[in-house]
Amino acid sequence: MDAKSNAVFWQEKWERGETGFHEPQANPLLTRHIAALDLPAGARIFVPLCGMSQDMVWLAGQGFHVTGCELSDIAVHRFFNDLDLTPDIRDVGPLRCFSAGTIRIFAGNIFDLTPDLLGLMDGIYDRAALIALPEDLRRAYAAHLLSLTGPVPELLVTLDYDQSCLKGPPFSVDEAFLRECYGQAYAFTLLESRAVEGGLKGRCPASENVWRFSPLPPSS
């Protein structure tokens, strides 16, 4: 699937209300492990492909400044509507920026987001971005994310399962892929691994893994 087809796929998901991937409260893996990033209150956290995730609300409640990027305008509008917030909205190149309080979300294709638009980030939280993308786009996404933020501490949630069992998304992402795409910039620590109760979509045994990415020191 190319980038355009992938964008159409997710836009249509939101238009049809097929949002079973949305969680109505903060993910417990986030609340258990965010401290592993060792970020102070006021730190700037990037949440790529954020949807209308309640994780952003929770992070803001912990004192962080949260920036998301989401393809679907529907998701972004619903996010702020559900919080009874009226965001400031402005066009920034091919994207639209919605902001209210310490949360802002860029609506549009993440590959159109630039470091200048994003600004400096102190950390990344990726629960549903990497695993939402087919393999070719995952590689492009990983490279783009590094170009946006540079190597900063990251909390990443992945799924690991037999990809032949399910078509995806969500897609299986194993440690070998992480090392191939991120190994030049990060050291990895597996913080937690747990079996998906009942199997993924009730069909396939799977493990959900939480990784901490720690930036490697610059080579001399």
From Swiss-Prot:
GO terms for molecular function: thiopurine S-methyltransferase activity. This is Thiopurine S-methyltransferase. Its EC number is 2.1.1.67. It catalyses: S-adenosyl-L-methionine + a thiopurine = S-adenosyl-L-homocysteine + a thiopurine S-methylether. GO terms for biological process: methylation; response to metal ion. It is an enzyme of class 2 (transferase). Belongs to the class I-like SAM-binding methyltransferase superfamily. TPMT family. The lineage of its organism: Bacteria, Pseudomonadati, Pseudomonadota, Alphaproteobacteria, Acetobacterales. One of its GO terms (cellular component) is cytoplasm. Coiled coil: none annotated.
